[in-house]
Amino acid sequence: MKLNFKKQFTTLAFVTGFAAAASSSIAGECRVAEASMDKPGGFPERALTMIVPYGPGGGSGQVAAAMAEAVTGLTGVSINRDHKPGGSGTVGMTAYMAAPADGYNVLEHIDDASSAHALDSSRPNPAEDLIPLVISQVTFSQIYIRSNETRYTDWPSFVEWVQAQNGKATIANVSKEGSMERVIMKFITDASDMQIQQISFDKGAPRYGALLGGQVDALFEQPGDVRKFLDAGNFKPILTVFNERPGVFSDVPTHKEMGMDFEPLLRFRGFYVHKDAPADRVDWLKWAFQRAYCEDSYQAFNDSKFMNVIDSYRD
């Protein structure tokens, strides 16, 4: 198990380094020159299917809807989204790999695909089994509490309260051991000398509802995914897992400022196609998804989800 954890951390660190690589380009700048591209042999002649390995209410569901809208607006090609949550993405990945590799099926996935393979080499290897169309979101994580919480109001008081609960405190998180969220929470609890129960939710909406309804004491999530709760004043962040304070969260301390000496792992989300899809169809799909990233509708979506803090585009 220790070897698996080491392999998994190495994989996540590599992926994070790739996703966070510095870019001289401006976030949101369009880097696809071609405004149009001829369809190869008439492809696609019908709607595409996008398999989304998570529920519609979470970050993956939101970005899948936004990208599908942008691709359709650009090309006129409809995209049917097929949500298959479960196993932190493994259910959807299995379904996708069993679908025809004809270019009509595309996949939304996140960094969990890399960690799943790192933990179990029999799982699909994203670097070998998939072709990336576009990475369209790169973001950091935070820990949230209810805005009207009175037992603690900031990170130091939260840590003090958790330590006094003798392991009974709870935080809502994703369900899969070995995911980026679970790895970071282990780093945080070890560094802060906390024992906290991680309550598992594979879908975003129940996870957010658990904090809103008081079933858990805190929430681990990315800011864009809970934007509506932040805007409504329901949630507030008390810790940012990033090396510096983003301007939009300038009043929230980072894990580094709270004495934690680990490199933050970032969440990334993107779109893929099977490696065996016809090459000319892959080229068209790459153009369609990368150019769709430039569409006003998608840029407005990313801006609304704090995805302009880090340059989110990777081809």
Residue ranges and their predicted role:
Residues 303-315:
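Surface-exposed aromatic
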Residues 28-129, 168, 177, 190-220, ...:
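N-terminal (or domain-start) structured segment
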Residues 111-122, 186-191, 217-252, 297-299:
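A ligand-binding cleft/hinge motif common to bilobed small-molecule-binding domains
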Residues 55-57, 111-112, 146-152, 174-179, ...:
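Short coil/turn segments
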Residues 1-45:
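Short, low-complexity disordered leader/linker segments with a strong preference
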Residues 36-38, 73, 95-104, 117-206, ...:
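Hinge/capping helix and adjacent helix->loop/strand transition within the periplasmic-binding protein
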